[in-house]
């Protein structure tokens, strides 16, 4: 059985809807640091984990992915990751994998299912020096455009704490109810997002 093709991100203009702050294009070119958006590789794993550890442990005491799991996903499915680099420095990232069930399970935390049609977003984090600048919003919008342009991917899914539900709703995610995944004493809401609209945005931006 053939596996649907998935490709890594190609450089393309970033188009953001109104209400999403932080578009690099709104800054003057002569003051804009060199920005690069690209899929991550295993060589980026240490930098990813450093940002993730600082971002998550300070808030919840847990990391979504340990260093070995970061390397695992960046080896198996780098095309489902996205990093934002400023002057060559990683400042924000998203790591995802494919999932093939309607809802997330405990297994979904560590598995990549190549035949899946769902992009499972495991982690989104921004370096502490670049927070409160809208970079998480820009990166998430860019990622959804990228994932929506993949023939194999039809929707995105993630789990988040209740306080973050309104943030993800701004990007087209809808609550699907309590998530079956539990991490320690933490519980989560599962969020689903159809990528059809994001695919259209990606096609238009490529013209």
From Swiss-Prot:
<dbReference type="GO" id="GO:0009416">
    <property type="term" value="P:response to light stimulus"/>
</dbReference>
<keyword id="KW-0597">Phosphoprotein</keyword>
<feature type="site" description="Important for the catalytic mechanism; involved in substrate deprotonation">
    <location>
        <position position="122"/>
    </location>
</feature>
<comment type="function">
    <text>Controls the night/day rhythm of melatonin production in the pineal gland. Catalyzes the N-acetylation of serotonin into N-acetylserotonin, the penultimate step in the synthesis of melatonin.</text>
</comment>
<keyword id="KW-0012">Acyltransferase</keyword>
<dbReference type="InterPro" id="IPR016181">
    <property type="entry name" value="Acyl_CoA_acyltransferase"/>
</dbReference>
<dbReference type="Pfam" id="PF00583">
    <property type="entry name" value="Acetyltransf_1"/>
</dbReference>
<dbReference type="GO" id="GO:0005737">
    <property type="term" value="C:cytoplasm"/>
</dbReference>
<protein>
    <recommendedName>
        <fullName>Serotonin N-acetyltransferase</fullName>
        <ecNumber>2.3.1.87</ecNumber>
    </recommendedName>
</protein>
<keyword id="KW-0471">Melatonin biosynthesis</keyword>
<feature type="binding site">
    <location>
        <position position="124"/>
    </location>
    <ligand>
        <name>substrate</name>
    </ligand>
</feature>
<dbReference type="GO" id="GO:0004059">
    <property type="term" value="F:aralkylamine N-acetyltransferase activity"/>
</dbReference>
<feature type="binding site">
    <location>
        <begin position="124"/>
        <end position="126"/>
    </location>
    <ligand>
        <name>acetyl-CoA</name>
    </ligand>
</feature>
<feature type="binding site">
    <location>
        <position position="159"/>
    </location>
    <ligand>
        <name>substrate</name>
    </ligand>
</feature>
<keyword id="KW-0808">Transferase</keyword>
<comment type="subunit">
    <text>Monomer. Interacts with several 14-3-3 proteins, including YWHAB, YWHAE, YWHAG and YWHAZ, preferentially when phosphorylated at Thr-31. Phosphorylation on Ser-205 also allows binding to YWHAZ, but with lower affinity. The interaction with YWHAZ considerably increases affinity for arylalkylamines and acetyl-CoA and protects the enzyme from dephosphorylation and proteasomal degradation. It may also prevent thiol-dependent inactivation.</text>
</comment>
<feature type="modified residue" description="Phosphothreonine; by PKA">
    <location>
        <position position="31"/>
    </location>
</feature>
<keyword id="KW-0963">Cytoplasm</keyword>
<comment type="pathway">
    <text>Aromatic compound metabolism; melatonin biosynthesis; melatonin from serotonin: step 1/2.</text>
</comment>
<feature type="binding site">
    <location>
        <begin position="168"/>
        <end position="170"/>
    </location>
    <ligand>
        <name>acetyl-CoA</name>
    </ligand>
</feature>
<comment type="similarity">
    <text>Belongs to the acetyltransferase family. AANAT subfamily.</text>
</comment>
<dbReference type="InterPro" id="IPR000182">
    <property type="entry name" value="GNAT_dom"/>
</dbReference>
<dbReference type="InterPro" id="IPR051635">
    <property type="entry name" value="SNAT-like"/>
</dbReference>
<dbReference type="GO" id="GO:0007623">
    <property type="term" value="P:circadian rhythm"/>
</dbReference>
<feature type="binding site">
    <location>
        <begin position="132"/>
        <end position="137"/>
    </location>
    <ligand>
        <name>acetyl-CoA</name>
    </ligand>
</feature>
<dbReference type="GO" id="GO:0030187">
    <property type="term" value="P:melatonin biosynthetic process"/>
</dbReference>
<keyword id="KW-0090">Biological rhythms</keyword>
<feature type="modified residue" description="Phosphoserine">
    <location>
        <position position="205"/>
    </location>
</feature>
<feature type="site" description="Important for the catalytic mechanism; involved in substrate deprotonation">
    <location>
        <position position="120"/>
    </location>
</feature>
<feature type="domain" description="N-acetyltransferase">
    <location>
        <begin position="35"/>
        <end position="196"/>
    </location>
</feature>
